[in-house]
Amino acid sequence: MIKDCLSDSVTLYQGDALNILATLPDAVMAAVLTDPPYSSGGVTMGARQTDPAQKYQQSGTKRQYPPMLGDAKDQRSWTMWCTLWLGECWRVARDGAPLMVFTDWRQLPALSDAVQAAGWSWRGIIAWDKRSSRPQIGKFRQQCEYVLFATKGRFVARTRTCLPGLYSYPVIAVHKVHLTSKPVALIEDLLAITAPQASVLDPFMGGGSVGEACIRTGRKYVGMELSQEYYDISRNRLTALLEAEK
């Protein structure tokens, strides 16, 4: 495990999220917002074990990204694995803390089971309209992904604003540093449910979009990443942003 404190408000870990989460004390995080590997992209084991670039990129895309780790689990093992790390997140979260986890339509039912099995109180689903997706002749486009929203116990409002349940942002290829990068503006919108300067836990840092959104909105950030390649990408990205904001 590697630990880097980039600033008083940004701490990064390189290693397995379950192992790292076990080292954190109870009830220290104000929120959890993360984008774990979906282990999706097919209904058979063979399809799930396909190269993530083939599962999640539209045909004709030329840009190559570092490989994703942990994206080939079958649904039952994925659900059990999610229950484990979600349980650790519940332990380190404060009472009333919000949980927001990205998923797709295939894994939404399994994720909702894991969230509740881990002790969280399920509060709803937020839709992210990507505005486009791979076309399927004779079928509806799968152009939405979802954010499962839950809390640790009783919901505690941190804002007087009424937040929408649908956000529409395109995926802009030139802004992506990860195969499944989420728009930073979308993350910033989701963070509106947290208090200013809240500490946000992200066990699956990927390309660092949640970290960037936290820095830009004045939140504290704790990010974890298994892949050394993506850890280096995120560390460099967030270091540059912190330097630019001095």
Where are these regions (language model features)?
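Core catalytic lobe of class I
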Residues: M1-D232
